[in-house]
Amino acid sequence: MAVRPICIVGDPVLHTATEPIPVGPDGSLPADLADLITDLYDTMDAAHGVGLAANQIGVNKRVFVYDCADARKKTVRRRGVVVNPVLETSEVPETMPDPEDDDEGCLSVPGESFPTGRADWARVTGLDADGTPITIEGTDLFARMLQHETGHLDGFLYLDSLIGRNARAAKRAVKSHGWGVPGLTWMPGEDPDPFGH
């Protein structure tokens, strides 16, 4: 369908919990959801992302797509969509995240990355594009992606969970880029790739 602009930190749609996708009595999903899912895949692929939530393209609906390896530097990837995800995780460490192992970025915070504490394991239950119940789980990078994308749908960015010097560095970065205000976007495939892919 179409590559859409990606909202940048500060847009209210990124800081608001999304609305669940309605499910019909027969388990059917709205007909227009297929177009949204296609746009999410097209946009994620053009941006070279490992995941993309609907509110990142300005749509306040509880759905995300992913194309993510189980671990960093692995070539085998899992690709899919989760409608109305519910997240379950192991305990999140209370220690300061490791700058190398816990580095995390976001298409809505283009070109920046910060060490972010995440649970080592995560599971998401929800529906696939046809309304069939699914469960996906993983560790390492895949678990990080599940937590990151579900966080988006709950109205949070990974910046919200940063601590200490990482939180201060992120705040400075947002200010230096002029972000933190409504209406800012970037266009994958047209604007320079902020992560240099």
Swiss-Prot record:
Catalysed reaction equations from the record: N-terminal N-formyl-L-methionyl-[peptide] + H2O = N-terminal L-methionyl-[peptide] + formate
InterPro entries, A to Z: Peptide_deformylase, Peptide_deformylase_sf
Keyword match Translocase: no
Cofactor(s), names only, from the UniProt record: Fe(2+)
GO biological process entries: co-translational protein modification; translation
Any single Pfam family the record assigns to this protein: Pep_deformylase
Cofactor annotation remark: Binds 1 Fe(2+) ion.
Keyword annotations from UniProtKB, A to Z: Hydrolase, Iron, Metal-binding, Protein biosynthesis
GO MF entry, a single one: metal ion binding
The organism's place on the tree of life at top rank: Bacteria
Annotated binding of Fe cation, by residue: 106, 148, 152
Active site residues per record: 149
E.C. numbers: 3.5.1.88
Matches recorded under Gene3D superfamilies: Peptide deformylase
Keyword Metal-binding belongs to the record: yes
Enzyme class, broadest EC rank: hydrolase
NCBIfam families for this protein: pept_deformyl, PRK00150.1-3, PRK12846.1-4
Family: Belongs to the polypeptide deformylase family.
Function text: Removes the formyl group from the N-terminal Met of newly synthesized proteins. Requires at least a dipeptide for an efficient rate of reaction. N-terminal L-methionine is a prerequisite for activity but the enzyme has broad specificity at other positions.
Record protein name field: Peptide deformylase
The encoding gene: def
